[in-house]
């Protein structure tokens, strides 16, 4: 009997081993692309989001690119059975594959932080990490998340981190539309600008004026045109000469800097696109975009063909709260009204 049991055990072990050997290897699912774009140049696909990572593929200039996800400086793409990463600014004409998706590049901030006393944004969530910029008292920042005592902020074309200590006076959550009551924040975004450089004093004035002009209530069904409300961008309306993005470079013009206000507003509204906000018209600054935001998320204004237009399709009014205090930060929020 014992010999028979040993034989059965050996047979079972052999069967399990054969099954394991014959079982097909677990297949890795190919990520589903959400957006398509066009390569503006020859692009190397990297295994990781790093210029030093292994090359795993290639796009020729003009090739169709399928985008899975994005980081401030990188895009995750899929080409055939290859999944990898490319530098974000090497593509253009990014559009959703599913028309119900939000525009390319949208991010949803989760909190708004009021700065009670001067604090520092760092390049990593660590007290010893490099300081990127000092945020003065009285500013508001939109936070992507809060983890382990650090708030994560979209900063130019990268991430920055804010220590959530006593220098942060208060934190307010950004609520889902279905939970929001009058006075609650539906969406918020902040962008940053330099305080030194050519014609910067005029740019500070223009950004502040642009914010002041667009602070208003938008009623249900109302169409909002940035040019109609904040323009014309001349001295009669208080605007100064400052540097503007033009044809891939910069040039001085009246109202330079107002595009940062319209672009920040666009990023506020993108998460709500098709969910209460209809983005009617938007144009970028061209293939290079605007460097104060991740590539592909700017909204140029100024000329007849350059305007940012949206419509409030909620069944309640919304209020645009836009601020800039000449201290390097543009903060804009959309608030539910009665």
Each language-model region and where it sits:
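Sec-dependent N-terminal signal peptides of Gram-positive bacterial secreted proteins and lipoproteins
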Residues: 4-25
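Core beta-strand residues in small-molecule sensory/regulatory alpha/beta domains
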Residues: 46-48, 121-126, 335-338
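Well-ordered beta-sheet/strand-loop patches within structured domains
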Residues: 102-106, 136-137, 146-147, 168-338
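A structural signal for short, hydrophobic beta-strand segments that form beta-sheets
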Residues: 39, 66-69, 142-143, 279, ...
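SH3/SH3-like beta-barrel superfamily modules
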Residues: 56-89, 133-165
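SH3-family beta-barrel domains
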Residues: 25-44, 57-61, 68-71, 92-120, ...
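Solvent-exposed, acidic/flexible segments
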Residues: 52, 58, 70, 128, ...
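Short alpha-helix capping/helix-loop boundary micro-motifs
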Residues: 49-54, 125-130, 210-211
């Amino acid at each position: 009997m014992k010999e028979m049991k040993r034989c059965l055990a050996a047979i079972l072990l052999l069967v399990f081993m054969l099954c394991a050997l014959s079982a097909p290897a677990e297949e890795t699912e190919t990520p589903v692309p959400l957006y398509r774009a066009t390569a503006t140049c020859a692009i190397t696909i990297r295994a990781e989001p790093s210029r030093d990572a292994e090359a795993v593929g290639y796009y020729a200039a003009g090739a169709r690119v399928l985008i899975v996800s994005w980081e401030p400086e990188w895009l995750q793409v899929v080409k055939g059975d290859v999944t990898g990463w490319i530098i974000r600014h090497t593509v253009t004409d990014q559009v959703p594959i599913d028309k119900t998706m939000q525009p390319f590049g949208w991010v949803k901030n989760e909190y708004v932080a009021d700065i009670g006393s001067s604090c520092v944004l760092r390049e990593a969530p660590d007290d010893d990490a490099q300081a990127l910029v000092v945020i003065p008292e009285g500013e508001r920042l939109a936070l992507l998340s809060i983890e382990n005592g650090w708030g994560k902020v979209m900063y130019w074309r990268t991430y920055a981190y804010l220590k959530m200590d006593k220098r942060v006076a208060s934190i307010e959550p950004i609520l889902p539309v279905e939970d929001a009551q009058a006075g609650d924040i539906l969406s918020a975004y902040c962008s940053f600008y330099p305080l030194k450089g050519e014609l910067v004093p005029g740019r500070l004035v223009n950004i502040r004026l642009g914010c002041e002009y667009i602070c208003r209530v938008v009623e249900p069904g109302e169409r909002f045109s940035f040019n109609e409300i904040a323009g014309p961008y001349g001295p009669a309306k208080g605007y100064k000469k400052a540097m503007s993005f033009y044809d891939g470079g910069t040039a001085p013009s009246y109202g330079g800097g107002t595009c940062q206000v319209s672009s920040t507003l666009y990023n506020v509204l993108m998460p709500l696109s098709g969910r209460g906000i209809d983005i009617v018209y938007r144009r970028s600054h061209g293939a290079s975009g605007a460097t104060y935001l991740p590539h592909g998320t700017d909204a140029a204004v100024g000329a007849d063909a350059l305007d940012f237009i949206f419509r409030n399709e909620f069944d309640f009014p919304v209020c645009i709260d836009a601020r800039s205090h000449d201290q390097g930060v543009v903060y804009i929020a959309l608030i539910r009204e009665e």
